[in-house]
């Protein structure tokens, strides 16, 4: 196979996004658009990849790292000018060069591979990736002669009435013979209404030189969509989420309502797991087999074991082991580690805490900066008081302990195995194993006192 190269155009400012964030870094299904492109390009196995950067160059480099080389387009003078910036890295090399924009996140590796193969099969100097558009408004039209050979690309504003009816459009992605590409770029000029170097002018230059120009029409028009504003970004997200949901369903995951379920690129879900409506799963989350993720739950960068049930809860940067159940309305904050068969009930918050196998934290409880052993019962309304106003402190609770309802545990404290805290206690000292700790005032009943209270009178 001959050498393959790729140039990703990512220097545009993206003013129509009206955003402080660089356009190609806007996420689609949780991943920056330009990273989607790079992922797909890498699957075509190019020898070298060059990303053209301009505004926000350092942000792009920090995202893509050493996966790409970079060339700076300091002044934006058109797509042709952008490709010129790669000449120092790719000029004079033999092979085929893919030119692709960084704002087309829906393009797939399969389409790009087909484009490469078609280009090489036609022995063309240039091949345009095209698509059939039901409404081609705004796109450049592919004009072919009577036998179907590509003649030129006509932009919308320059198209005649007949040309405007053409439904085959230019997607902005091309394959070029690398040497022909840079030779033709040297012959482009800025004699147009925008005063820019157009990459599309190369097609006419190559045709005039008698070189072969081909066009490969891809099957799915959705892949052609460029993202230039928030409306297009929303559409791209919808399409990408649909693709991802369909992939998971084909892999054995049940979605109760795919249209309201939002799964990021890169999330892993095991077979026979059920995802209910309104669920959002983000980042590098891994979910095991035979789980139930209840309606309106949100899971971010977490690892969920097999046979876990999550009901209407938020889980962030946490681990939930096999057979545990969480919720409804629980919140696992970063560094929560919930053991096998643990029960985390309604309105429980866990942060930077390890809860071992079989422990039950039923309701209305805060567990922060703590290590809980096995088979503990934590009653209603328990607070692990971990913050003294300056520093966080740790609490350790041993196996088989019983923490009575409304206990305040003021860290740092260690509660031993099989120890018990009485309901309503404020624990400020260690509790030895098998001891009962009572830390509350003795009850006093004042006879007849209630009658003296003004709100108790008739």
Curated annotation (Swiss-Prot):
Disulfide bonds: none annotated. InterPro entries: Bifunctional_GlmU, GlmU-like, GlmU_C_LbH, Hexapep, NTP_transferase_dom, Nucleotide-diphossugar_trans, Trimer_LpxA-like_sf. Residues 231-251 are annotated as: Linker. GO terms for biological process: cell morphogenesis; cell wall organization; lipid A biosynthetic process; peptidoglycan biosynthetic process; regulation of cell shape; UDP-N-acetylglucosamine biosynthetic process. Its cofactor is Mg(2+). Its EC number is 2.7.7.23, 2.3.1.157. Transmembrane segments: none annotated. One of its GO terms (molecular function) is magnesium ion binding. Keywords: Acyltransferase, Cell shape, Cell wall biogenesis/degradation, Cytoplasm, Magnesium, Metal-binding, Multifunctional enzyme, Nucleotidyltransferase, Peptidoglycan synthesis, Repeat, Transferase. Residues 1-230 are annotated as: Pyrophosphorylase. It is found in: Cytoplasm. It comes from the Bacteria. GO terms for cellular component: cytoplasm; membrane. SUPFAM superfamilies: Nucleotide-diphospho-sugar transferases, Trimeric LpxA-like enzymes. UDP-N-acetyl-alpha-D-glucosamine binds at residues 9-12, 23, 73, 78-79, 140, 155, 170, 228, 333, 351, 366, 377. It catalyses: alpha-D-glucosamine 1-phosphate + acetyl-CoA = N-acetyl-alpha-D-glucosamine 1-phosphate + CoA + H(+); N-acetyl-alpha-D-glucosamine 1-phosphate + UTP + H(+) = UDP-N-acetyl-alpha-D-glucosamine + diphosphate. In the N-terminal section; belongs to the N-acetylglucosamine-1-phosphate uridyltransferase family. This is Bifunctional protein GlmU. It comes from Enterococcus faecalis (strain ATCC 700802 / V583).
């Amino acid at each position: 196979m001959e050498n393959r190269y790729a140039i990703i155009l990512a220097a545009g400012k993206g003013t129509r996004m009206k955003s402080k964030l660089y356009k190609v870094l806007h996420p689609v299904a949780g991943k920056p658009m330009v990273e989607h492109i790079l992922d797909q390009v890498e699957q075509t196995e190019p020898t070298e990849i060059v990303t053209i950067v301009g505004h926000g160059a350092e942000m792009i480099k920090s995202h893509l790292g050493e996966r790409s080389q970079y060339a700076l387009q300091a002044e934006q003078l058109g797509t042709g000018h952008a490709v010129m910036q790669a000449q120092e890295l790719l000029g004079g090399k033999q092979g085929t060069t893919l030119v692709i924009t960084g704002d087309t996140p829906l393009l797939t590796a399969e389409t790009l591979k087909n484009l490469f193969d078609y280009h090489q099969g036609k022995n063309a100097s240039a091949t345009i990736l095209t698509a059939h558009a039901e409404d081609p408004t705004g796109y450049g039209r592919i004009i072919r002669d009577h036998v179907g050979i590509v003649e030129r690309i006509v932009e919308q504003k320059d198209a005649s009435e007949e040309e405007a009816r053409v439904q085959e459009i230019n997607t902005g992605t091309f394959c070029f013979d690398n040497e022909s590409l840079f030779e033709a770029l040297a012959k482009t000029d800025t004699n147009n209404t925008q005063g820019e170097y157009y990459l599309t002018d190369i097609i006419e230059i190559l045709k005039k030189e008698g070189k072969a120009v081909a066009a490969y029409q891809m099957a799915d028009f959705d892949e052609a969509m460029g993202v230039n504003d928030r409306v297009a970004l929303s559409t791209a997200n919808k399409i990408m989420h649909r693709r991802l949901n369909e992939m998971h369903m084909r892999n054995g995951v049940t979605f109760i309502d795919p249209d309201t379920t939002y799964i990021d690129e890169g999330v892993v879900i095991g077979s026979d797991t059920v995802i209910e409506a309104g669920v959002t799963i983000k980042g590098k989350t891994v979910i095991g087999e035979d789980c139930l993720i209840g309606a309106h739950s949100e899971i971010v960068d977490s690892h969920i074991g097999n046979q876990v049930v999550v009901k209407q809860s938020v889980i962030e940067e946490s681990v939930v082991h096999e057979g545990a159940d969480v919720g409804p309305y629980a919140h696992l904050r970063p560094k929560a580690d919930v053991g096998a068969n643990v029960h985390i009930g309604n309105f429980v918050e866990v942060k930077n805490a390890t809860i071992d196998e079989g422990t039950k934290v039923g309701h209305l409880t805060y567990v922060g900066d703590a290590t809980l052993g096995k088979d503990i019962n934590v009653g209603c309304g328990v607070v692990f008081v971990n913050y003294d106003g300056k520093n966080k402190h740790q609490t350790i609770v041993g196996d088989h302990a019983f923490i009575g309802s409304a206990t305040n545990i003021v860290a740092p404290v260690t509660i031993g195995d099989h120890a018990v805290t009485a309901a309503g206690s404020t624990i400020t000292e260690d509790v030895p194993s098998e001891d009962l700790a009572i830390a509350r005032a003795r009850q006093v009943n004042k006879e007849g006192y209630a009658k003296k209270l003004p709100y108790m009178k008739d």
